[in-house]
Amino acid sequence: MEHASLVAFLEGKLAPEQFGDEVGAEVSACNQAFRSKGLGYIVVSDGPCTIVTRDHAKRLLEAVADQRLTFQIANYAADCIIMSDDFEFADDAVNEAIYFVEDDSVAPTLEEVRAAIEQLSR
């Protein structure tokens, strides 16, 4: 994933659908490799240090809630944010929201996503 594309999406300069189109094949390849070999690679290019804000996290969650971005793509984006040295969280609420999206053990329900969005509004 290109750092610049992820930041553009988080900042609202790239629509969720455009972001999904741009990274969809990469996400599918990673998920397929994980299913078939038990190992998938998450890669994000280097970029300037970016502080992930509550607005950024809300944009990611709202894209999932509004079905403008699949959970799989949002999950991959969250993995990229967490694994990259070029992203930092503005506060604990942002940290929790990104880790919520990163947890792919069970896809969250719409109610859980809405509750996570609400937490960022406090």
Which ranges hold each PLM region?
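Acidic, Ser/Pro/Thr-rich low-complexity regulatory regions
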Residues: 1-122
